[in-house]
Amino acid sequence: MGPWGEPELLVWRPEAAASEAPVPMGLEVKLGALVLLLVLTLICSLVPVCVLRRPGANPEASASRQKALSLVSCFAGGVFLATCLLDLLPDYLGAIDEALAALHVTLQFPLQEFILAMGFFLVLVMEQITLAYKEQSGPPPREETRALLGTVNGGPQHWHDGLGVPQAGGASSAPSALRACVLVFSLALHSVFEGLAVGLQRDQARAMELCLALLLHKGILAVSLSLRLLQSHLRAQVVAGCGILFSCMTPLGIGLGTALAESAGPLHQLAQSVLEGMAAGTFLYITFLEILPQELATSEQRILKVILLLAGFALLTGLLFIQI
């Protein structure tokens, strides 16, 4: 109604509607984001391999490089801790709550936390089965009959022996290789889901914001992942292969999201959330029982390691805050 009680004429103005409606997400924008994410993440994954895997000229240079790698790995540990607590967990909890609300499901049972626990126990059971099988293959030496977390009577200095360095019995290298695989898998799966968020996006402005945030986030994570794998004494070829795999996951998610944009529904979202919850549970295990204990177990440069750990946490925290 008009100001004098007269009915107003409803006139459709195309220019006004176009200014209020979100700009549709074009296929070329998604393809550009896909290629850019692939190239940048791949470069960030391979740079640590090229820089830190050069053969040392003498034992002193090799020892110095190992100390530097340990310090940088503490920084990466802070990045992983922030990724676990401030990125993976909130994304998973928000997505599964949204999916359950869309399906009009009300739960009395803590399903979200149960899925996290299942992901946690999945890695634990796999590691224990692998370790038990390796121990039954032959009597391990006395120094290898230690707990899975690397704490023995001999002190914490034996921790790094279990990070992929070949041993006589081979019992300690198997859990380390498994943990490395689980770490890559959990990050790769989460990257697919982050790519899905871009691929399913129909608002171009929002999609560009997501792509920019992912570029920064994935670049930092790619460097941290390569440092983590190098610290596990894996071969450079294996680390490079894991970096390539990780680099392809977010573009894969963008492609899948683009293809499924028209058919995405609450059931699809619920299934995706369950998988993401399992991945978050595995990442919880790797973060708190592998990455942080290993870096803080040795007695060298404790204060500097804590500072670098906090710096890595603060860096990703600031990045996530900027996204808000």
Swiss-Prot record:
Record topological domains on the Extracellular side: 1-30, 90-104, 201-206, 259-272
GO terms for MF: zinc ion transmembrane transporter activity
Top-level taxonomic group: Eukaryota
TM ranges: 31-51, 69-89, 105-125, 180-200, 207-227, 238-258, 273-293, 304-324
Membrane topology term: Multi-pass membrane protein
Catalytic activities: Zn(2+)(in) = Zn(2+)(out)
Cytoplasmic topological intervals: 52-68, 126-179, 228-237, 294-303
InterPro entries registered for this protein in UniProt: ZIP
Function (record text): Transporter for the divalent cation Zn(2+). Mediates the influx of Zn(2+) into cells from extracellular space.
Family statement drawn from the similarity comment of this UniProt entry: Belongs to the ZIP transporter (TC 2.A.5) family.
UniProt-recorded name of the protein: Zinc transporter ZIP1
